A protein has these predicted regions:
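A detector of single, family-specific signature residues
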Residues: 1-354
Length: 354
């Protein structure tokens, strides 16, 4: 159990710090604001040592919100200096803080410190990702932005066909520039794809997991990389159920008393990019993967809605991928068919007995 809790509200240029001493305080206390840089971090730790009343740094717990890349310098610096860091969802901290009126960086740091103290039993220690995984995430994020720019440029080019009031020479000039921009972006995307493959090949663990994923027919390279990145190479999100929940393909019921009893549905609190990629993988697998195609056709023949069947396929793809990673093996169509047949036979026997 930790004794000294530090809440850090991180922004682009500064970090606001509050602390809570479990033995001597009844509520968290604000410390100061520091620059979001190694110099500021050194000053922060120096001031905290003066406030901790001799509590060893081994008994310290730093907690901050996941703010994208802004909190990475702080977390990496603290871990390099032997500190324990807990990165928590900003939404989780907000919902656990009760009714709030107004906010600022100082108040947020106080709330984060109190959250760390009250919920220390739920603490998940931050572990620095490997250099290869960090490079893969940066390259994949850059590729996604290039694709978004290309899509926007293509839409702009398409809209030129209905543009009115332009002279032919101006229209041709704009179309030419947009076409060149699309070609440039396509070349950059191809270059990033090559870089991503080089990063994967340079790390044996990444390469092994990547090969297991793409062995599932219907799951392409981009979906495989996205799953590796968002799961921390299957170390941050460690189970298929957690991944299904994170991607927004796990269904939840809403029931209360006799007035509320909604059927199970998926939540909008999800990573929609991964969900979109899984949707494309499910559609591809329903046509090209014999195991999933058989399930797709069989379930549709029972009158199930198409959207429900595709969502079930997304879940099955996640479950299969996690099993492949766990067992360190590739996808085997014959084994999956035999396993599915045996499972259906058991279900039929149970229904008959009932």
């Amino acid at each position: 159990m930790k004794k000294f809790f530090i809440g850090v509200d991180v922004s682009k240029d500064t970090v606001d710090v509050s602390f809570f001493d479990d033995d001597r305080m009844k509520s968290p206390e604000y410390l100061a604001q520091y620059s979001n840089s190694p110099k500021g971090f050194r000053e922060m730790v120096k001031d905290l040592r003066m406030c901790c009343h001799g509590v060893s740094s081994e008994q310290w717990l730093f907690c901050c919100e996941t703010t994208g890349r802004y909190d990475h310098p702080l977390c990496h610096w603290l871990v390099d200096h032997g500190m324990v860091v807990w990165r928590e969802s900003a939404l989780q901290i907000k919902w656990s803080s009760g009714i709030q009126r107004g906010k600022n960086d100082r108040v947020d740091s106080l709330r984060i410190a109190e959250y760390a103290w009250r919920h220390q039993d739920k603490m998940q220690k931050f572990v620095k990702p490997s250099e290869s995984l960090s490079n893969l995430k940066a390259a994949f994020t850059h590729r996604r932005r290039l694709v978004e720019k290309r899509t926007a440029t293509r839409c702009q080019l398409k809209s030129m066909s209905s543009e009115k009031g332009l002279s032919a020479s101006v229209a041709r000039m704009i179309v030419r520039d947009l076409s060149r921009e699309i070609e440039r972006l396509s070349a950059s995307i191809a270059t990033m794809d090559e870089s991503i493959q080089e990063i994967i090949r340079s790390d044996s663990e990444l390469d092994r997991n990547y090969r297991h994923i793409i062995s599932v027919k219907g799951v392409g390279p981009i979906t495989a990389v996205a799953l590796i990145v968002c799961s921390g190479n299957f170390k941050a999100i460690t189970s298929a159920k957690k991944m299904a929940c994170y991607c927004g393909v796990a269904s939840f019921r809403s029931q209360s008393g006799t007035s509320i009893n909604r059927k199970a549905s998926v939540s909008n609190l999800s990573n929609r990019q991964i969900k979109s990629l899984l949707s494309m993988a499910a559609r591809s697998a329903s046509r090209s993967n014999p195991v999933f195609a058989e399930y797709f056709n069989r379930t549709l023949s029972r009158g199930k809605p198409v959207a429900l069947v595709y969502n079930n396929l997304r879940n099955k793809i996640i479950t299969v991928i996690y099993k492949l990673i766990e067992r360190d093996c590739d996808f085997d169509v014959d084994y999956m068919r035999m396993h599915s047949t045996g499972q259906r036979a058991n279900e039929s026997a149970i229904r008959g007995a009932v």
